[in-house]
Amino acid sequence: MGVEHDKLGFRPCFLIQFFYHTSNDEARPLHTNLRRARLFSDLLNHIVANDSKSTRADDRLDNMCNMLLLKMDSDTNGKMAQDPKEPLDFQVCPTPVETAKRINTNFERYMAKYPFLFEDTSTKTIKFDDETIHAIVYWLQGINLKSAAPETLSTAFQVFRSANVKQGEGQYFTPQRIIESAVKLMEIDYHDKVIDPACGTGGFLFETYSTLLKRASGEQRDEIRTWAHRNLYGVDLDSINVKLARALMIGARDGSTNIVLGDSLREQKWQDFPMLTPVLGCETDGSYDVVLTNPPFGERLKIRATDAKQAKYSICQHTSGGYPNDKYSDTELGLVFMERAYRLLAGGGRLGIVLPETYFFSSSYQWFRKWVSRHFDVLAVMNIPMEAFQGFCRAKTNFYVMRKKSTKGAASMKLPSWAQPGKTWITYAPTIGINKDGKTLYRVTKEGTRTREVDDTVLSDVTALLERSNSSTSCFVATPESLVNSYLGVPQYYDRISVKEFERYVQTHLQGFTARTLGDLEDAGIISIRNGHGSPSADLRNGDIPYVKVSDLRAGMVNFNPTNMVSLSVAERFWRGSDSGLSPWSIVTPSRASKNIGEPSMLLPGQERAVFTKETLIMNATAEALFDNFYLGWALDLDVVRKQWGRVVFMQTNREDLGNRYREILIPIPDTREHGESVSNHYRQYYRSIAQSRAKFLKARESQNR
């Protein structure tokens, strides 16, 4: 019989080859989120299937973290060893028993050296069985964890934590590429006192310290370490996060113990965390120059109204409909961290925070934007492409840099060197060096050849800003007095490249045509635009009237799905009468929850008796227009028109949303009806021929089915 292997490729432990690893052998870093996630997912599966000691998810996470601490410590010691050929501590021995003994001996020494990392110091061994310890060491020994320590620890935590009840806690750890650009943008220096009140595994703190250390000369490096001891703080509610973050800073030779366990928001619980008050207590309010954080976010992650009232969080005084209110309401944690940051910051202090984009445009969060306008000036908005967090969530986020407004006459800290008074810097750069699979994204040539250059246009924009050079994907815009009716927090809205391309096209290709927005045409009565009828629930779909969803609008056609049909009575309820109100040749496009928003589909004769989901727009030319629906469809189908939709389609949490921003789309308008018909004639002929063929097909089908 052949030797059996599990998914990780582990062979029976007595067959594992034994050899010494040195620091010279540490040459295999885990450079991508995907590789890290796969490694730890496979390790978790192996532990669940084979380990006899650790049966609880929390125990597995804790013990795996302890193994990672030992590995990282071994890597650090190896890099500092005088003899690069000196064997590393973290490697397999000839047998599982010997490997486990060695690891547990090293763990006991590690606990004695860093006792403040551990809440419970009574257990001085790794609670995996010998074979599991042997297998973990075997798989990790040849990998350089320290080269990507922040993301490695974050990924391990994410994978192991997702296996238990904490899966929905909204802890989406920040990828290193976001952290790097964010820390650069914050321009933190040794004058600043910094805190991350939701520090996770310490990515922002580690990058801040590392950045200052890299800029320091030999003599200054000791001063930077002293600065970190006195000015770099972190808080997290999860004890394992705190342990990992502290260990990360120790690995950077910071030695800082300023990362503490505690609840940053619920003040009534602060007495339960003895080390928290010196970091977050009332006497620390107004003492920090920088708050830098990626707080947990999610619609279900809220602080209760009673807790908000006790802490007097004014940001929690709002209605569920999106308006300010005197009463306190349950509020998402990520938003409440805004007020915690405001309290911690001195006048003119800087806040750098990752937040979902939906807070900055949805009508449900008007109260939030009004609160921000009263308390902060928005200095910068840094686009975070969807791919960055796609491995764990699909919410669209951005990194926001804000400055706490000072009271009149009070002293205030100076602006960052790149900031312009009264203006906000926005980058809508489309890439951040991470693809949709979590792998490193490389630039590809026009010929389709992948280069070795990382495609991180966000970092390029930040670098250009700091170097005072130009960028085609960023700009300064005037900061509005209020964010309530502004899209300042949505970077892509300020990408007007598609608008400029359209204007050039009209000038060079459509002589005599003018450019007008859909909103302007609608207001003038030249076109009509309405939403679809509504969305019948699944249990009502049992009739013979087609119900058209956004997924049924494809390739310019309205397609009827035979599995989505409703009865006539249901249809009339959604039509609000006996007629659908639709007419042949109407133009239909998705308006929500579709990647094809803006793509025109034409309603053919005979398709009028249908119920369209409310997530569609239905457009028609009126008698006032110098064009018909065929021209309207042709105009909407132009590439230079379709590209404009990407600017106005926002992400409502994790779904595409158009709102009324369709009104900003520009289309060409002919000077005469004849001119319009001449350019769109091929469009007219195409759809008329399809309609004729469809009518013949349906007639033949009907006769054969009698």
Feature-to-residue mapping (PLM):
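A short glycine-rich beta-alpha junction/loop motif
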Residues: 400, 609-617, 649-675
